[in-house]
């Protein structure tokens, strides 16, 4: 096990011997971290913000979670998931395998993202929302540019398989897309 002495660890953890826990990480009680995960990775911009993983969360193998993020209680992160910096993930959220959360995103409680979902930087997914496989939330209206205009999905919405939502769009309460 490769765990930084600066990480703060709760009780009853199950951390794989092949996982790496970096500085500035707080892991609460009952968290499970799978094989080959990188937890608390920094980048050139975010080098000293805390990553907080709240109690009873499960992070499956090969997932990477950057500093400055917050993962809520009882959440499940699938295999090979990337969660970039400054992402806030609520309680009881499920993020499927091979999904990509591009940073500065909010995913509220009780939301479910199936496998292979791409959430563009700056997107906001409100509570009780379902995104099915291969959904793409874009954020650059005139690529390649420095404009980042994330998608907002309001509560109780469903976005069906292979749907692409364009930058800056707001899907209203209870939307069904696909």
Language-model region placement:
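Blade-loop segments of beta-propeller domains
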Residues: 45
